[in-house]
């Protein structure tokens, strides 16, 4: 059996496309959801009701607290309180227990850092099923899949630490160089980042209705958990204020003309990698690179992430920049800024990987495997041997051996385990 856990609608196209691949291989599939919007989307897509399973929030007071959830991404980003993180954790454990899982089953999950992911990993200790986590690769048409987790918690990160030389034997300098030149050119021609979108009035109405139903039916959607946790308020005036603040990022502040600058792209404030894999939040990282750029005799150009929804944070960044000489904020094409810079500084953003591809000196202050991809041999292996050729947003793929490649990742995990024993 192959299970696809959809914690929200984010991986909907990706996982439904993968499910079709497994169906073509005569595999049984089940979708596991925890929100009504995803549930109805699956039905409208023709998925049979028997193939859709719903996680319910249990009031399991007999179970112990999970102290490590205090530092979980869902708690840190205020998707839920610690109390409800514990409830979701044990509800997921109870749900997994009801499935009668076998070692031959495969569970496609989140990025490995969510509350549900931790529960799935914990339950896996006793029931040796396979897991597959996924994350954006920031390369069009490719997705990062990993049987252990994402970024610093991934098998790929472990491969770098183990430095298993035979994995890098396929390195082809010319092929990598040609790919990178083509990649940069394509990005320069059309560099589009999905923008943060505000809900329409109809979407807001549907959102409120579904959230109320989820609360009544004990379906633990992120929206309902935020309400239960007291982390959201119904405030129409705030929506109007938010709209005005967000628009302010559309123009450069304090125009810069020099090419003698360091580029610093900000990550979204609730980015999992910033919250759990860095000692610097966005504001601290900005101050770090202001100091560093000055020590290098460079100006600093900052770009707020296009998907940033925190208006208060945006205004805070602008206040800091307005008070600093030689520091600018820009909304120009990211690749234009990378290519025009002397160097690039990031926390642990994927933009750091893009800067490496562009041949720029790149600095990382957060923990990430992207910093290791300065080595072209590892970069080649990552692009050609590790990433899966399926688009994260659309689920579109141009090859038919997706399942075979995913199976190879599982075999690679076993190889690393054996390598560690030797």
Model-based region annotation:
Residues 1-51:
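N-terminal subdomain of nucleotide-sugar transferases
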Residues 287-328:
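Catalytic donor nucleotide-activated moiety binding site of glycosyltransferases and closely related
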Residues 155-207, 373-422:
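Leloir-type glycosyltransferase catalytic cores
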Residues 5-18, 39, 60-167, 174, ...:
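Active-site and donor-binding regions of nucleotide-sugar-utilizing enzymes
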Residues 158-272:
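A nucleotide-sugar donor-handling region in carbohydrate enzymes
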Residues 9, 109-112, 116, 331-376:
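A donor-sugar binding/catalytic signature common to diverse glycosyltransferases
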Residues 255-287, 298, 302-308, 407-411:
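Active-site donor-nucleotide binding/catalytic segment of nucleotide-sugar enzymes
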Residues 33-36, 57-58, 135-136, 259-271, ...:
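Short loop/turn segments at strand-loop or loop-helix junctions that form parts
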């Amino acid at each position: 059996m192959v299970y696809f856990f959809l914690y929200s609608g984010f991986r909907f196209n990706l996982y439904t496309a993968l499910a079709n691949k497994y169906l073509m291989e005569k595999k049984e599939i089940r979708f596991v959801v925890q929100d009504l919007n995803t549930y109805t989307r699956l039905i409208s897509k023709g998925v049979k009701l028997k193939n859709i399973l719903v996680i319910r929030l249990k009031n399991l007071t007999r179970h112990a607290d999970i102290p490590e959830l205090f530092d979980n991404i869902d708690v840190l980003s205020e998707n839920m309180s610690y109390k409800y993180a514990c409830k979701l954790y044990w509800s997921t454990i109870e749900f997994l227990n009801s499935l009668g899982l076998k070692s031959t089953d495969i569970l496609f999950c989140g990025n490995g850092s969510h509350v549900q992911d931790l529960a799935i990993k914990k339950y896996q200790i006793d029931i040796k099923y396979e897991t597959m986590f996924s994350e954006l690769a920031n390369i069009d048409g490719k997705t990062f899949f990993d049987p252990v987790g994402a970024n610093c918690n991934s098998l790929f990160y472990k491969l770098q630490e183990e430095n298993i030389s035979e994995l890098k034997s396929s390195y082809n300098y010319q092929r990598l160089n040609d790919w990178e030149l083509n990649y940069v050119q394509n990005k320069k021609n059309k560099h589009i980042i999905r923008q943060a979108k505000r809900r329409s009035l109809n979407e807001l109405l549907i959102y409120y209705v579904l959230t109320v139903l989820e609360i009544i039916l004990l379906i633990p959607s992120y929206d309902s958990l935020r309400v239960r946790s007291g982390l959201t308020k119904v405030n129409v005036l705030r929506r109007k204020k938010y709209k005005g603040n967000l628009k302010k990022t559309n123009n450069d502040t304090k125009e810069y003309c020099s090419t003698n600058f360091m580029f610093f792209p900000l990550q979204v404030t609730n980015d999992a990698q910033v919250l759990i894999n860095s000692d610097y939040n966005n504001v601290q990282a900005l101050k770090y690179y202001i100091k560093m750029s000055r020590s290098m005799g460079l100006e600093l150009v900052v770009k707020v992430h296009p998907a940033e929804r925190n208006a208060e944070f945006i205004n805070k960044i602008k206040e800091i920049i307005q008070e600093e000489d030689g520091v600018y904020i820009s909304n120009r094409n990211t690749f234009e800024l990378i290519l025009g810079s002397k160097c690039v500084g990031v926390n642990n953003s994927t933009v750091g990987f893009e800067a490496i591809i562009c041949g720029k000196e790149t600095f990382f202050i957060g923990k990430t495997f992207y910093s290791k991809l300065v080595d072209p041999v590892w970069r080649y292996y990552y692009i050609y041997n590790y990433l899966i050729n399926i688009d994260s947003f659309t689920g579109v793929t141009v090859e038919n051996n997706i399942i075979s490649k995913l199976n190879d990742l599982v075999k690679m995990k076993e190889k690393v385990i054996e390598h560690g024993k030797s």
